[in-house]
């Protein structure tokens, strides 16, 4: 191509579009679709879960032995009862296959369900190995104000792949 071809092509293009006017806006305003009630509730749950569970917080948890934690001011006998399986979990949560964001939501929902149903103990199954959830779940549990203690579950409740969690449900009229 040379400059004469460019000039000729430009002249043809100008002749073709001569007299064409741009489209004018018809003043129609498009509204964004309203969020459904489910979307709003999901967003609130995520906000609620994120307010309790930070991924950057690193509590001091045992490196050796079974995973365990006891809130300050709680009798150490409670941890022993969890270890022996004296508490029977009323609610179970299986986190296999969940992403971290989904697991946080489910964990927050489980703790709320325990409080609502007056369930003192629950079991959280995070899986074997050294996966992300196995590392993150104890760190998240330590941060929640309703969690009094947790211990690696006995064999009948999942052993290394699960935690038994003691929940603060307020005043209990009787012991389970």
Swiss-Prot record:
Associates with collided ribosomes, but not with correctly translating polysomes. This is Ribosome rescue factor SmrB. The keyword RNA-binding applies. Its EC number is 3.1.-.-. HAMAP family: SmrB. Gene3D superfamilies: 3.30.1370.110. SMART domains: SMR (SM00463). The lineage of its organism: Bacteria, Pseudomonadati, Pseudomonadota, Gammaproteobacteria, Alteromonadales. SUPFAM superfamilies: SMR domain-like. Belongs to the SmrB family. It is an enzyme of class 3 (hydrolase). It comes from the Bacteria. One of its GO terms (biological process) is rescue of stalled ribosome. PROSITE patterns: SMR. Residues 93-168 form the Smr domain. The gene is smrB. GO terms for molecular function: RNA endonuclease activity; rRNA binding. Keywords: Endonuclease, Hydrolase, Nuclease, RNA-binding, rRNA-binding. Acts as a ribosome collision sensor. Detects stalled/collided disomes (pairs of ribosomes where the leading ribosome is stalled and a second ribosome has collided with it) and endonucleolytically cleaves mRNA at the 5' boundary of the stalled ribosome. Stalled/collided disomes form a new interface (primarily via the 30S subunits) that binds SmrB. Cleaved mRNA becomes available for tmRNA ligation, leading to ribosomal subunit dissociation and rescue of stalled ribosomes.
């Amino acid at each position: 191509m040379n400059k004469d071809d460019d000039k000729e092509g430009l002249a043809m293009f100008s002749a073709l579009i001569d007299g064409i006017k741009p489209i004018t806006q018809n003043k129609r305003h498009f509204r964004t679709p309203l969020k459904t009630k489910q979307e709003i509730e999901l967003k609130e749950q995520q906000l609620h879960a994120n307010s309790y569970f930070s991924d950057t917080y690193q509590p001091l948890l045992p490196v050796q032995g079974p995973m365990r934690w006891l809130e300050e001011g709680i009798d150490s006998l409670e941890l022993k009862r969890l270890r022996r399986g004296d508490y029977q979990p009323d609610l179970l949560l299986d986190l296999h296959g969940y992403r971290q964001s989904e697991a946080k939501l489910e964990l927050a929902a489980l703790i709320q369900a325990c409080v609502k149903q007056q369930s003192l103990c629950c079991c959280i199954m995070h899986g074997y190995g050294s996966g992300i959830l196995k590392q993150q779940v104890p760190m998240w549990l330590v941060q929640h104000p309703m969690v009094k203690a947790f211990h690696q579950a006995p064999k009948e409740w999942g052993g290394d792949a699960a935690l038994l969690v003691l929940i603060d449900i307020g005043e209990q009229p009787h012991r389970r």
